[in-house]
Structures are given as C-alpha cells and as structure tokens.
C-alpha cells in the first residue's frame, strides 16, 4: 500500500519564514512615516493572485454587503478579511490552520482597529464547531486545494451556508494528468492535498 501524500502544512516552503510579513509591514510603516492604508499593505497581506482586485471580485459576485456574516477559509495573515470588513462593514470569521499566520493576522487586525468585525480562529475547518452560525457568504483564496476529504469539506460548507447564500473560491485545478511522483512533490512542497481536473472540480461542487 502506498503511503499518504499528505504532509504537515507547516512543512510548506511558502511559510517557513512567517516573520517576514511583520518585518515587511514595519518597514513599510517606517518608510511612509505613518500606518499604511489597507490598500498600501495589500502587497504584503494578500497571499493570492491579483490582491484586492480578487477580493473586490468576490464582493461583487457574492453580493457581500453591510452586516453580512462571511466565512473566510484559509485566511492567512488576514488581508482579505480586513479589506472585506473595512469596505463592506461585514462580519468575518477568518479561519486559519497555521497558528503563526493566525497570530500575525490578529496583530494586524488589532492595529487597524477591526476586531469588532473580524474573528480570527486558529482551527481546522473540517473539525471546528461554529455553534449553528450560518453564513451569507463563504470565500477562499488559494486554500481549498490544501484541504483533504473534499466531500466532507463541501458537506460542511453546504450546511454552513444560508439558503440563497454565495460561495467564492479561487483555487487550483489540473489541466492534465500528473504522475504519482509529481503529486507527491506537490503535496510536500505546497501541501496540495486535492488536485483534480476542472470537470471533476465542478462535478464535486454539484454533488
């Protein structure tokens, strides 16, 4: 029997030096001689492609508005959550598995006085109990492919989403088949626990 491809998420090469995020923030603050705006900090705290443009797209497509309750999965150091909260005055539950990233997210959110809008949660989305909270919107940027047990994940998200709620996900999919060794390498370097074709991805969402 083949060993599992899954690796601890802390082993990801992307996140071996989390201190750099705060160091970059402090350097930017020093160079500006003031606290940077959320737009100015977006090159640092948006850990996905297209920065706040992608967040604006999610706001538009999922109709995020004031007082909406939003779930952000794999929230990183909290960039999208802070931008969402500041722009829409929505309430964000930002779930991040890695404690080091979640700690930085909490510190930056405190700096921008957005604690009333954002709840930073260091937890596994597959295990966390939301105590019957229902979400108007679920968003995620480059995080879902890290999470194994796709069927379980989608069932959880379906049950968390309000009727007529919206979900927005920026994610990876396979454009062609890859070998077992390639999958193993992606799992080790990028914690890629679920990579499928676009067709399969869409079928999973429908089911």
Language model region names:
Residues 151-166:
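A short glycine-rich, Lys/Arg-flanked "PGG" loop and its adjoining helix->strand segment in the class I
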Residues 193-206:
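Short alpha-helix
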Residues 1-38:
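N-terminal, positively charged/glycine-rich alpha-helical extensions of SAM-dependent methyltransferases
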Residues 128-138:
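A short acidic, Gly/Pro-enriched loop at the edge of an enzyme's catalytic core
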Residues 48-66:
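Conserved alpha-helix/loop element of class I SAM-dependent methyltransferases that forms part
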Residues 172-192:
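Short, glycine-/aromatic-enriched active-site segment of Class I SAM-dependent methyltransferases
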Residues 69-73, 77-127:
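Class I SAM-dependent methyltransferase SAM/SAH-binding core
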Residues 137-149:
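A short SAM/SAH-binding and catalytic strip from SAM-dependent methyltransferases
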């Amino acid at each position: 029997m083949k060993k599992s491809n899954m690796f601890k998420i802390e082993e990801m090469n992307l996140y071996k030096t989390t201190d750099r995020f705060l160091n970059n923030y402090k350097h930017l603050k020093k160079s500006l001689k003031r606290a940077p705006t959320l737009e100015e900090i977006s090159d640092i705290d948006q850990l996905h492609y297209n920065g706040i443009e992608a967040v604006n797209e999610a706001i538009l497509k999922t109709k995020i508005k004031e007082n909406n309750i939003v779930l952000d999965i794999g929230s990183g150091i909290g960039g999208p959550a802070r931008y969402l909260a500041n722009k829409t005055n929505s309430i964000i539950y930002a779930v991040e598995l890695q404690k080091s990233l979640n700690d930085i997210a909490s510190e930056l959110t405190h700096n921008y006085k957005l604690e009333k809008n954002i709840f930073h949660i260091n937890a596994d989305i597959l295990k966390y109990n939301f105590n019957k909270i229902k979400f108007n919107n679920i968003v995620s940027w480059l995080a879902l492919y890290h999470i194994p047990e796709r069927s379980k994940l989608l069932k959880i998200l379906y049950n968390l989403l309000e009727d007529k709620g919206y979900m927005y996900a920026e994610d990876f999919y396979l454009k062609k088949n890859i070998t077992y060794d390639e999958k193993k390498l992606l799992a080790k370097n990028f914690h890629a626990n679920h990579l499928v074709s676009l067709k399969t991805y869409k079928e999973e969402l429908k089911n």
